[in-house]
Amino acid sequence: MYFREAVSKRIYELCDKYNYIPNKLAEMSAIPPTTLRSTLANNVENPSVYNIYKICKTLKISLKEFFESDLFNFDKFDD
C-alpha cells in the first residue's frame, strides 16, 4: 500500500465514523471538493498535511488520532 492509499482509506473510515459524506467534509473543512475527490481517488501523490489538518479540525480530532491507525504501519507501505 502507498501512503496516499492509506490517507484515502483513513478519510473514508472517518467519514463513516462521523457520518460525513466526502463533499460535506470538503465543504466543512474548506477544502475544494475536487481536491478531496482526487485525494480519495488516490490521484494525489503526496496528500497535503495541511488538508489533513483541516479535516482533523472539522472532525475535532488530533493529527495524532488521524495517524493512529494500522493503515499507517510503515511495514505495510510500498516505497
Where are these regions (language model features)?
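Short, charged recognition helix plus adjacent turn
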Residues: M1, S38, F67-D79
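Short, basic-rich loop-to-helix N-cap that marks the start of a DNA-contacting helix
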Residues: N43-K57
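Residue-level detection of the helix-turn-helix DNA-binding "recognition helix"
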Residues: Y12, D16, A41, L71
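Recognition helix of helix-turn-helix/homeodomain-like DNA-binding domains
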Residues: A30-P47
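Short alpha-helical "recognition helix" segments of helix-turn-helix
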Residues: L25-A26
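A short, Lys/Arg-rich alpha-helix, primarily the initiator
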Residues: M1-I21
